[in-house]
Amino acid sequence: MGTYYRRHLLGSDLQRVYDLASPRIRQYLNAEVENVVERVRGADRVLELGCGYGRVLREMAPHVGRAFGIDIAAANLRSASSYLSSLKNCDLLLMNAVRLAFADARFDATVCVQNGISAFGVDRSKLVSEAVRVTRNRGQILFSTYSPRIWADRVEWFRAQARAGLIGPVDESRSREGTIVCQDGLRLTSASGEELRDLFARSGQVARIREVDQSSVFAEVTRDGLS
């Protein structure tokens, strides 16, 4: 999946994906970001993993000292630079989320939302352990995935993307709740709350699992410095 997103849905195409969102999907996206902003408000340094064109960073930045976004696609960072041009407290870096070039305990909060745990196509344990490593003791770590309750709206969103020519047609026979398969090779899964809890437990952290808006599932962690 990480390879797919290095070749598809980059820059302006990624922005078009969000332009196609239905009212229910827009509600989901807004509720997810609002929860993030509430949790990181007042933090000095916040990192977003997989920042794309800057959609979440733009909402976070006014409420934090400095917002950092990393992405594996240079095209996304170019779009983000333009999208965030009015903000003076954002730093954008080309970086792999499982090999972060940051010192330990560098950030007050680390954020990975909208199913990045699956969409990045990387080792999930390494993704979580890197997020833990770069977050300071008592700092906040937020990961989110899709709630099963948003499945029907989620798959319809992908159908809309396919109709717009952004992705291949949805393979209806192979797509099941939690997993979307398209005919161009896209295969996108999701993680359950229990999976997120277990991933953080392996890194010595206790995750609070919480559903937001009946659309996203958050793992909310206050970083334990003993791990």
Name these PLM-found stretches.
Residues S125-N137:
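A short glycine-rich, Lys/Arg-flanked "PGG" loop and its adjoining helix->strand segment in the class I
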Residues V98-T110:
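A short acidic, Gly/Pro-enriched loop at the edge of an enzyme's catalytic core
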Residues M1-R41, R55, L142-P169:
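Conserved class I S-adenosyl-L-methionine
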Residues R55-R99:
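Class I SAM-dependent methyltransferase SAM/SAH-binding core
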Residues D184-S203:
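Short alpha-helix
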Residues A109-D123:
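A short SAM/SAH-binding and catalytic strip from SAM-dependent methyltransferases
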Residues G50-G52:
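Class I SAM-dependent methyltransferase "Motif I" SAM/SAH-binding loop
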